[in-house]
Amino acid sequence: MCGRMHHIMNKNEHFKSGFVAVVGRPNVGKSTLINALIGDKIAIVSDKAQTTRNRIICVYTDEAKQIVFMDTPGVHKPKHKLGEFMVDAAIESLKETEAVLFVVAGNEKRGPGDNFIIEQLKRVKVPVFLVVNKIDTLKKEELLEAIVSYQDAYPFAGVIPISAKDKENLNEVLNVLEETLPEGPQYFPEDMITDQPERLIISDIVREKILLATRDEIPHAIAVDVDEMKTR
């Protein structure tokens, strides 16, 4: 996992820092959540499975903390041997984080994909927080029903209802993680928000637009190669 690079000294002696994995099945809003927390377009958004091909690191920094979010692909029910290897690799990476955010869609019933991830999370010893997304589409009793359904399946360290699209209750996500992270200096410069090169971010954004526009017309295994970039 990232090799745990050299720390950068911080003036705040109680500064907190650490790595947080974000997992969940496709179309629950993982990438939308990360983009909203970071305040920039980094992670590709699509309802097709496995559109996030690489583990994307996104960095949130303020005067009190640095949270390194990892949008982790591969935690899904495998269909072949390669898929099994990807799941094992993804779970191993989760074990090296300080916390895990398990993002679910509150407006959908807990399904086989969610249950598979829950079973994998039982192999992880760090705190796992249930993030119930899309609360803007729910009534209070529907939200409560969704929370109870997931709490029956796993002993979460906490539950955070949010709307990533409307940026509702995102501060609670940050506050909960700040309480969870250990004290320590930051890993990345404060102006860094991702480890992804700009060219790769642009190619992913183009790929996202193609997937959204064409949907069933083309497979999700498309590649975009950026030949030239110009600043305007």
Predicted regions and their residues:
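Conserved nucleotide-binding/hydrolysis micro-motifs of P-loop NTPases
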Residues: 49-51, 73-76, 106-110, 135-138, ...
